[in-house]
Amino acid sequence: ADTGDGDFITEGGGVR
């Protein structure tokens, strides 16, 4: 997963 505050790996976000 990428970094960010998205849901799972969608919206360019990562798992937080």
UniProtKB/Swiss-Prot annotation:
GO terms for cellular component: extracellular region. Cleaved by the protease thrombin to yield monomers which, together with fibrinogen beta (FGB) and fibrinogen gamma (FGG), polymerize to form an insoluble fibrin matrix. Fibrin has a major function in hemostasis as one of the primary components of blood clots. In addition, functions during the early stages of wound repair to stabilize the lesion and guide cell migration during re-epithelialization. Was originally thought to be essential for platelet aggregation, based on in vitro studies using anticoagulated blood. Its main location: secreted. Heterohexamer; disulfide linked. Contains 2 sets of 3 non-identical chains (alpha, beta and gamma). The 2 heterotrimers are in head to head conformation with the N-termini in a small central domain. This is Fibrinogen alpha chain. A long coiled coil structure formed by 3 polypeptide chains connects the central nodule to the C-terminal domains (distal nodules). The long C-terminal ends of the alpha chains fold back, contributing a fourth strand to the coiled coil structure. It comes from Mandrillus leucophaeus (Drill). Conversion of fibrinogen to fibrin is triggered by thrombin, which cleaves fibrinopeptides A and B from alpha and beta chains, and thus exposes the N-terminal polymerization sites responsible for the formation of the soft clot. The soft clot is converted into the hard clot by factor XIIIA which catalyzes the epsilon-(gamma-glutamyl)lysine cross-linking between gamma chains (stronger) and between alpha chains (weaker) of different monomers. Forms F13A-mediated cross-links between a glutamine and the epsilon-amino group of a lysine residue, forming fibronectin-fibrinogen heteropolymers. Transmembrane segments: none annotated. One of its GO terms (biological process) is adaptive immune response. Keywords: Adaptive immunity, Blood coagulation, Coiled coil, Disulfide bond, Hemostasis, Immunity, Innate immunity, Secreted. The keyword Lipoprotein does not apply. It is found in: Secreted.
